[in-house]
């Protein structure tokens, strides 16, 4: 029998709280499938959960390679290790990309809210030259500016990871739990959990 409440979220909130004194505790690895079929991985910042949802929010640049990869294949896995408590969360699911061209007004408002939740310094990276492009001396000496009250620039994207499977490992207690979601007959998400060998 499953539950509508994601049982792994309490474990994750506990790990976030217990490791909050570590500046790196909000950094997670996000893997996608490259256009060449090979793994592609990078570190991103956890920006919280979508309101009243299990969906994980991540900010990114529309010009980054991961956007093209996610448009080709929206499946992804996040790996999050908490070094003080020795806990690992592998969160597998589908990512929705919300950019300026999204036709849904509610999603555009969500994107704007996420934009303003970031510091001005974080927002400035979206007006810098294209990530991964060759660097020239003129670009590196230019000062980038952004009006703090202006809304999201076109390069800013909000990613929403919809968890489908969560693999939790606690190395201190030698405990491993596997959570998986499925849709009920009414279309609601339901979670099941299973204790497995570490």
From Swiss-Prot:
One Gene Ontology molecular-function label: FMN binding
Gene3D superfamilies: Electron Transport, Fmn-binding Protein, Chain A (2.30.110.10)
Cofactor: FMN
Pathway(s) it belongs to: Cofactor metabolism; pyridoxal 5'-phosphate salvage; pyridoxal 5'-phosphate from pyridoxamine 5'-phosphate: step 1/1; Cofactor metabolism; pyridoxal 5'-phosphate salvage; pyridoxal 5'-phosphate from pyridoxine 5'-phosphate: step 1/1
Entry keyword Flavoprotein: yes
Catalyzed reaction equations: pyridoxamine 5'-phosphate + O2 + H2O = pyridoxal 5'-phosphate + H2O2 + NH4(+); pyridoxine 5'-phosphate + O2 = pyridoxal 5'-phosphate + H2O2
Cofactor note: Binds 1 FMN per subunit.
Record key words, sorted: Flavoprotein, FMN, Oxidoreductase, Pyridoxine biosynthesis
Keyword Mitochondrion among record annotations: no
Domain of life: Eukaryota
Stored Pfam families: Pyridox_oxase_2
Residues holding FMN: 42, 59-60, 66, 121-122
Entry's EC annotation: 1.4.3.5
GO biological process, one term: pyridoxine biosynthetic process
Subunit field text: Homodimer.
Family membership noted in the UniProt record: Belongs to the pyridoxamine 5'-phosphate oxidase family.
Function: Catalyzes the oxidation of either pyridoxine 5'-phosphate (PNP) or pyridoxamine 5'-phosphate (PMP) into pyridoxal 5'-phosphate (PLP). Has an in vitro catalytic efficiency for PNP approximately 300-fold lower than that of PPOX1.
Protein name, UniProt field: Pyridoxine/pyridoxamine 5'-phosphate oxidase 2
Source organism of this protein record: Arabidopsis thaliana
């Amino acid at each position: 029998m499953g539950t509508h409440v994601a049982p792994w979220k309490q474990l994750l909130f506990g790990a976030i709280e217990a490791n909050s004194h570590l500046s790196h505790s909000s950094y997670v690895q996000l893997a996608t499938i490259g256009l060449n079929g090979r793994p592609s991985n990078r570190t991103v910042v956890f920006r919280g959960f979508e309101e009243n949802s299990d969906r994980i929010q991540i900010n990114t640049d529309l010009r980054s390679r991961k956007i093209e990869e996610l448009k080709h294949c929206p499946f992804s896995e996040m790996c999050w290790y908490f070094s003080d408590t020795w806990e690992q969360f592998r969160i597998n699911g589908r990512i929705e990309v919300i950019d300026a061209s999204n036709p849904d007004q509610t999603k555009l408002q969500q994107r704007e809210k996420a934009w303003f939740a970031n510091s001005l310094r974080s927002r400035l990276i979206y007006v810098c030259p294209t990530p991964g492009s060759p660097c020239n001396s003129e670009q590196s000496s230019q000062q980038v500016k952004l009006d703090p009250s202006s809304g999201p620039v076109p390069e800013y994207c909000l990613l929403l990871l919809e968890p489908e499977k969560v693999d939790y490992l606690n190395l201190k207690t030698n405990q491993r739990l596997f959570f998986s979601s499925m849709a009920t007959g009414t279309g609601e998400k339901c979670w099941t959990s299973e204790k497995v060998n570490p």
